[in-house]
């Protein structure tokens, strides 16, 4: 009975962890009106980008380590850019909006996971 309960707990944790990893970003290139298209980023793209060059607006999934002007300019093949990268779901709505703090959200999920695992491990001891 105890082994079965442990297995169910591990299965539940695996499901919860896998659903919390995927980042969602707005994904539009120069929308005519407000961007409403969003997509789930692949695991190697861990940030959302909003970049503005003149009237051109780019909103897409991005790699946070590549979030610098030099890389963005070369990748998007543009001459100048204002940009912002953020790491929370749908945080790249527009350039003017303040981003949500994805780091706090990630820290909270990690703390919850660690607490749950420790509780499951220590429960048989008490």
UniProtKB/Swiss-Prot annotation:
It is a lipid-anchor; GPI-anchor. One of its GO terms (molecular function) is complement binding. InterPro entries: CD59, CD59_antigen_CS, CNF-like_PLA2_Inhibitor, LY6_UPA_recep-like, Snake_toxin-like_sf. Residues 1-22 form the signal peptide. Residues 23-110 form the UPAR/Ly6 domain. GO terms for cellular component: cell surface; compact myelin; external side of plasma membrane; extracellular space; plasma membrane; sarcolemma. This is CD59 glycoprotein. It comes from Rattus norvegicus.
